[in-house]
Structures are given as C-alpha cells and as structure tokens.
Curated annotation (Swiss-Prot):
Pfam families: Ribosomal_L32p. InterPro entries: Ribosomal_bL32, Ribosomal_bL32_bact, Ribosomal_zn-bd. Belongs to the bacterial ribosomal protein bL32 family. One of its GO terms (biological process) is translation. Keywords: Ribonucleoprotein, Ribosomal protein. Signal peptide: none annotated. Residues 1-21 are annotated as: Disordered. The keyword Zinc does not apply. This is Large ribosomal subunit protein bL32. One of its GO terms (cellular component) is large ribosomal subunit. It comes from Streptococcus equi subsp. zooepidemicus (strain H70). GO terms for molecular function: structural constituent of ribosome. Residues 7-20 have a biased composition (Basic residues). NCBIfam families: rpmF_bact.
Length: 60
C-alpha cells in the first residue's frame, strides 16, 4: 500500500485548496425580453443577440 512519506500540514493542505472555489455565473440583462440570461446562450424566450432564434417552451 502507498503511504505518504510525511504528514501534510494544515497550511500546505489549505494552500493547495485555495483554488477550489465556485464562481458566480455571468448574467446579463436582455433588453429585448426584459429578462436576465447567461452570456452566449439562448434566453428562455428563445432570443439570442436580440433576434428570435428558437421557439420557446410553453407551459401547459
């Protein structure tokens, strides 16, 4: 079995884990629909860059 040669200190462990973080998704306001949507993605109403591209899913 592999066993670590030395004990990993709290400081060493925490320095390694500083890059494990969540980033908030980038959200922009769409003037066409008046809703917020993520960048470079089609909005829920089917608009992309101010143009209607897709048919929006209607709730039944």
């Amino acid at each position: 079995m592999a066993v670590p040669a030395r004990h990993t200190s709290k400081a060493k462990k925490n320095k390694r884990r500083t890059h494990y973080k969540l980033t908030a998704p980038s959200v922009k306001f769409d003037e066409t629909t008046g809703d917020y949507s993520r960048s470079h993605r089609v909005s829920l109403k089917g608009y992309y860059k101010g143009r209607k591209i897709a048919k929006a899913n209607e709730a039944k």
